[in-house]
Amino acid sequence: MAQEKPGCSNPVPNGDCPIIEKMEKRTCALCPEGHEWSQIYFSPSANIVAHENCLLYSSGLVECEAPDLPNTVRNFDVKSVKKEIGRGRRLKCSFCKNKGATMGYDLQSCTKNYHLSCAMEDHAILQVDEDHGTYKLFCQKHAPEGQEPTQRDAAVKAPFLKKCQEAGLLNVLLEYILEKMDLIHGRLLNETASESDYEGIETLLFGCGLFGDTLRKFQEVINSKACEWEERQRLMKQQLEALADLQQNLCSFQENGDLDCSSSTSGSLLPPEDHQVRCQESPEVQAGSGDSL
């Protein structure tokens, strides 16, 4: 269990607050973005590398408070991590039977020890309290009342699906699921969805890792749409600037008298030379043309 405690934020060494070497945070370049195991911490001097989750759930490791650090960076000192590694060498994992098991159940009556990955394989329940900075581990039997398991009981649910497939009913089950999704989809589009519909979709998307790839693709769509609208705004800004410049030029022409706004458009549309020839025609020609009509 990693739990925050008040720490020294003063970098200047004195009798009460010596300089402590901290683990440095890095992100795995090969893990999917946002993956829960992608955050790692390491110490170049001590040649130690550890997953962030393994540090957080280690029972004997305490994270120090550091007001000067961003919320996304954990504050583990190298000395405490080395001490926890030494403690783990004496503890055997109840699942894989190998040493290095620094995670234990929060209740003293549960004496099992695990590696974090082994605890998840054994269907342990992880409890996180971000407000108090606590990370606890419970077995299925002693989980707090109302606690929603973060790791589902795959040992029960996987055989159920296999039995459905053996009975030829897996397609029927999936069709019912799709019908439910289509129903909720229609309600969302028609704005008639209930609060339970919204909660069901949110739980489906964020309550498990099944749709992790879908959410990552959706994030790409959001970024693409944002770039598209930014480009539209840029083009609209250019057009507005061009229109404003054109309007200013027209006003300048009017002020300088380059535009004769008083001229009427109801006058003769004939070219000047044709208009002059028509005016010089004799009255006889004009009268003859009138008689021919």
Swiss-Prot record:
The keyword Lyase does not apply. Pfam families: zf-HC5HC2H (PF13771). A zinc finger (C2HC pre-PHD-type) spans 25-61. GO terms for biological process: regulation of immune response. InterPro entries: EPHD (IPR034732), PHD-type_Zinc_Finger (IPR051188), Znf_RING/FYVE/PHD (IPR013083). Keywords: Metal-binding, Nucleus, Zinc, Zinc-finger. It is found in: Nucleus. GO terms for molecular function: zinc ion binding. A zinc finger (PHD-type) spans 91-143. GO terms for cellular component: nucleus. Residues 262-293 are annotated as: Disordered. Its main location: nucleus. The keyword Electron transport does not apply. This is PHD finger protein 11A. It comes from Mus musculus. The lineage of its organism: Eukaryota, Metazoa, Chordata, Craniata, Vertebrata.
